[in-house]
Curated annotation (Swiss-Prot):
Family: Belongs to the purine/pyrimidine phosphoribosyltransferase family. Xpt subfamily.
Keyword terms of this UniProt record: Cytoplasm, Glycosyltransferase, Purine salvage, Transferase
Single GO MF annotation: xanthine phosphoribosyltransferase activity
Location(s) in or outside the cell: Cytoplasm
InterPro entries recorded: PRibTrfase_dom (IPR000836), PRTase-like (IPR029057), Pur/Pyrimidine_PRTase (IPR050118), Xanthine_PRibTrfase (IPR010079)
Underlying gene: xpt
Pathway connected to this protein: Purine metabolism; XMP biosynthesis via salvage pathway; XMP from xanthine: step 1/1
E.C. numbers: 2.4.2.22
Quaternary structure (record): Homodimer.
HAMAP family given in the database record: XPRTase
Catalytic activity: XMP + diphosphate = xanthine + 5-phospho-alpha-D-ribose 1-diphosphate
Protein name listed in UniProt: Xanthine phosphoribosyltransferase
């Protein structure tokens, strides 16, 4: 997605050789038109897979996931990082390590909203080591739901997340692939 790549290069802030900040359009302030294009692109890539639900994790995955859900005309379900007092029935849970925050969280999804009848598309904002996507895949497996694929907005291709997801047998679609953050500069795959 050329528009997304341009936005990452122009508005992304390199924190260090492993961390890219995209708060201006994805992780804090959201560019709704760009997220609409992200959702439309995921729809075009997975429209023939029988998607019944979009699955993501709070908070930064919600914007691209909700836009994808609009294009698929299906519900968007997000894993919660804390169990609310209103969740009185059963739930699926797994542990996910955040590369950016260097923190492990237990995330949950109510059994009421995910079942073996679902075919999910997992959407996430970033792919680094793949822990968030693998955690969501684990939740889908606990529900005996089918996972049609993983949609990633920004992939850091210099890390091993893509490989880990493919080794798990998952189809991965990354809309923007960052090859390097060296020299305080964003270099996309194909530009190196």
């Amino acid at each position: 997605m050329e528009l997304l790549g341009q936005k990452v290069k122009e508005d992304g802030v390199v924190i260090d050789e492993r961390i890219l900040k995209v708060d201006g359009f994805l992780n804090h302030q959201i560019d709704a038109k760009l997220m609409d294009e992200v959702g439309r692109t995921f729809y075009e890539q997975f429209k023939d897979k029988g998607i019944t639900k979009i699955l993501t994790i709070e908070a930064s995955g919600i914007a691209p996931a909700i836009m994808a859900a609009l294009h698929f005309d299906v519900p968007c379900l997000f894993a919660k990082k804390a169990k609310p007092s209103t969740l009185t029935d059963g739930y699926y849970e797994t542990s996910i390590h955040s590369f950016t925050k260097n923190k492990t969280s237990t995330v949950i999804v109510s059994k009421e909203f995910l079942s073996e009848e679902d075919t999910v598309l997992i959407i996430d904002d970033f792919l680094a080591n793949g822990d968030a996507s693998l955690g969501l895949y684990d939740i889908a497996q606990q529900a005996n739901a089918k996972t049609a694929g993983i949609g990633i907005v920004v992939e850091k291709s210099f890390q091993n997340g893509h490989q880990r997801l493919e080794e798990a047998g998952l189809t991965v679609s990354s809309l923007c692939k960052v090859a390097s953050l060296e020299g305080n500069k964003v270099t996309l795959v194909g530009e190196e």
